[in-house]
Amino acid sequence: MANYPQLNKEVQQGEIKVVMHTNKGDMTFKLFPNIAPKTVENFVTHAKNGYYDGITFHRVINDFMIQGGDPTATGMGGESIYGGAFEDEFSLNAFNLYGALSMANSGPNTNGSQFFIVQMKEVPQNMLSQLTDGGWPQPIVDAYGEKGGTPWLDQKHTVFGQIIDGETTLEDIANTKVGPQDKPLHDVVIESIDVEE
């Protein structure tokens, strides 16, 4: 199972634990610097510097994902710590399972500060068989079957962490009433992110 760190809720050596405090409750994640070093460094540095403090989840689509990390709350903003967009860090060890922490982008190698948390609870049966045929590892296909997720985003968005506590908060946020462009009618705010290394 060591190959697929998302399948283990314990924080392993080399992983980083972060707690995201929101006005809807807390979510705890473990991050994977061995899998996505630049992405994790970007997120952790932003978290420590307070970059994400006060930023909202500007796009919420129930049974798909919640997206945040944009200081402009438009979906168009946000910068990386590297001064520009940075490259994708795809891996055959991390997948867009339910609860995955993944980078939002506008195409290949356009990562900035925006991220999303996967919240799709069920993968259709016909898609699961396509995953098997497509060469996805069996433990991951099984996890998609048990937990849900968005496998069509694999190898398109960098997965750099996984929720390990606070799924009820994730669900509460996902069930927020939204208006145009999937923006919550009442702000869902990231108050702070604590990094426990």
Curated annotation (Swiss-Prot):
GO-annotated molecular function: peptidyl-prolyl cis-trans isomerase activity
Listed EC numbers: 5.2.1.8
Catalytically driven reaction(s): [protein]-peptidylproline (omega=180) = [protein]-peptidylproline (omega=0)
Keywords tagged on the record: Isomerase, Rotamase
Enzyme class: isomerase
Entries under SUPFAM superfamilies matching the protein: Cyclophilin-like
Keyword Isomerase: yes
Keyword presence, Isomerase: yes
Stretches that traverse the bilayer: none
Gene3D superfamilies (UniProt xref): Cyclophilin-like
Domain PPIase cyclophilin-type residues, every copy: 14-195
Family: Belongs to the cyclophilin-type PPIase family.
Task of the protein: PPIases accelerate the folding of proteins. It catalyzes the cis-trans isomerization of proline imidic peptide bonds in oligopeptides.
Protein name: Putative peptidyl-prolyl cis-trans isomerase
Organism expressing this protein natively: Staphylococcus aureus (strain COL)
